[in-house]
């Protein structure tokens, strides 16, 4: 019972309140005790206040009370609990595939040429090779693309791509638009759980039909998975991210590399909101983006494709005034399916779901970004490895909790297209 007993000091004297799940504020004006707070279920209310207090309000509404022999005011009826809240099913999805950067004819003339000889990173630059580290070209967050134009590539048998990422980083490659495959960093175990930077080399065999001489285009997408936090101040946050070196066997082609990462930072959502996916740079995650010509689809999905597919939908919530509801987005699928989904709500990046690793399946949709009394835009950027069918599987809104009361939350500015 003491868990529902709330002492509160006011300039007019102390107040003791029994009953509600949470007391937020108490104030005495004239002879009325004004209370605000939350109730998850119907609850009684009893108030002990300074001498002369003879009335009570709860969240701005008068509460009929009776005086007791214990010098308290007791509510005649319980305070109301939270009404039953219903969340809509998510439907009306539309989809579009991307990664045109993998096509040999893609126009990369506006991309940065990766030809630096020295780096600000603590990672050594391979001797005689250009710097490929993304940060040295101004790309610090999210995914980064590379395109290498190869000449004199006759006899090329395999490609070796060395790269550096944070936890669970991955790399996928295409040659002349044909998928070469995906490589990913291992899932940490107890001995590596605190490891901040992961490095490895992916080796891809070149298909026979692509071994002819002439011009070829090698396209590489790296999911960098953030920088080391460097809590010990050892400059580990300066370790390279992205490709670190490229080599070939069976041939010695000349390579000219170009790099593209995130666009200019969103002036409202900030630089951490977006990476270098084509859809991110084109605003596919934003409210109001014209997706009317996208393909209508339904979940669950089973796509066999290396690369990125975007899914968009809208949904409307109608949480009653005076109710504080916490809502999450839950994704569920066969854990053997290898794909990831970046989650954007009203243009805001709320996290990444890794289906075959987890453990997180529910992502909080913060009120303010979430319009609890309005229309919302949800976008998923799904990165598929192609070694399994990829989803999404089941995607649904989840009620994480609700109370009558709460604190009003202003809508967060979420500009769109």
Feature annotation, model-predicted:
Residues 1-370, 377, 383-417:
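Non-catalytic C-terminal accessory domains or segments of carbohydrate-active enzymes
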């Amino acid at each position: 019972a003491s868990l529902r007993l709330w002492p509160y000091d006011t300039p007019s004297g102390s107040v003791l309140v029994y009953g509600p799940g949470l007391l937020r504020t108490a104030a005495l004006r004239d002879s009325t005790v004004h209370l605000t707070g939350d109730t998850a279920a119907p609850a009684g209310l009893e108030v002990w206040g300074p001498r002369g207090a003879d009335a009570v309000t709860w969240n701005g509404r008068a509460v009929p009370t009776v005086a007791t022999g214990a010098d308290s005011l007791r509510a005649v009826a319980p305070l109301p609990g939270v009404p039953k809240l219903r969340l809509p099913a998510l439907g009306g999805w539309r989809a579009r595939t991307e990664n045109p950067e993998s096509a040999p004819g893609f126009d990369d003339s506006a991309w940065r040429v990766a030809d630096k000889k020295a780096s600000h990173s603590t990672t050594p630059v391979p001797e005689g090779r250009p710097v490929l580290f993304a940060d040295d070209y101004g790309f610090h967050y999210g995914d980064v693309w590379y395109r290498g134009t190869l000449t004199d590539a006759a006899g090329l048998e395999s490609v070796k791509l060395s790269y550096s990422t944070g936890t669970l980083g991955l790399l996928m490659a295409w040659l002349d638009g044909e998928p070469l495959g995906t490589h990913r960093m291992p899932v940490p175990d107890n001995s590596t759980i605190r490891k901040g930077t992961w490095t490895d080399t992916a080796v891809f065999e070149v298909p026979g039909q692509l071994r002819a001489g002439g011009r070829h285009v090698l396209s590489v997408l790296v999911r960098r998975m953030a920088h080391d936090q460097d809590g010990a101040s050892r400059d580990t946050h300066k370790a390279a991210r992205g490709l670190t070196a490229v080599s070939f066997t069976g041939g010695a082609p000349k390579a000219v590399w170009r790099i593209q990462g995130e666009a200019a930072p969103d002036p409202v959502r900030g630089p951490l909101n977006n990476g270098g996916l084509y859809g991110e740079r084109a605003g596919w995650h934003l409210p109001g983006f014209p997706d009317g010509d996208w393909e209508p689809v339904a979940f669950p999905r089973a796509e066999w494709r290396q690369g990125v597919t975007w899914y968009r939908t809208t949904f409307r919530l109608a949480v009653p005034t005076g109710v504080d509801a916490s809502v999450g987005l839950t994704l569920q699928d066969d854990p053997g399916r290898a794909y990831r989904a970046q989650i954007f709500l009203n243009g805001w990046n709320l996290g990444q779901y890794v289906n075959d690793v987890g453990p997180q399946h529910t992502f909080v949709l913060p009120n303010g970004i979430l319009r609890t009394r309005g229309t919302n835009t949800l976008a998923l950027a799904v990165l598929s490895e192609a070694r399994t069918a990829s989803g999404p599987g089941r995607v649904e809104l989840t009620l994480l909790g609700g109370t009558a009361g709460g604190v009003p939350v202003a809508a967060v500015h979420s500009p769109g297209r």
